[in-house]
Amino acid sequence: MKIYVGNRKIEDGSYQQIPDPSILQHVADDAECTMIILDGVLRRYNLSQVAEIIKLCQKKLRLGGILKVVEVDFDLLVYVYQKLGNIVELNNAFMTNEVRSLLTLDLLLEMMKANAPDVANVNFSRVHNIEFDVEFVRK
């Protein structure tokens, strides 16, 4: 089973799309998923909730299954602000009430290590200017 958690339109029909990670508990059995994509959803939760989401994803992944996280990197966001000085755009991002935690790649890696010890980082890339895309595999 492949699960996409996020609000972007996806073309790949092999994924079941859900808007919220809490729904994962109801749509997949433990160790059923071969792929879970969390696309821009972690920032909607505080850090303790993010830790619980990570644990849930680990539980739902089968051995060799991949967890892919796409998220805004706060370090890059600050860098872009310092270079471009567009405080209006930065404020708009926080005014939507969609941001409850500020994640960086390093923080996510630390949280994965602490909350999902059976998952290892396997791939990392940048998506756009301020987002990271990182994949973890359950071992």
What are these regions (language model features)?
Residues 51-66:
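A short glycine-rich, Lys/Arg-flanked "PGG" loop and its adjoining helix->strand segment in the class I
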Residues 34-41, 50-53:
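A short beta-strand submotif of the Rossmann-like class I SAM-dependent methyltransferase core
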Residues 47-48, 78:
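Short, function-defining helix-loop hinge/capping sites that tune catalysis or transport
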Residues 24-38:
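A short acidic, Gly/Pro-enriched loop at the edge of an enzyme's catalytic core
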Residues 43-45:
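A short His-aromatic
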Residues 1-28, 66-139:
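Class I (Rossmann-like) S-adenosyl-L-methionine-dependent methyltransferase catalytic domain
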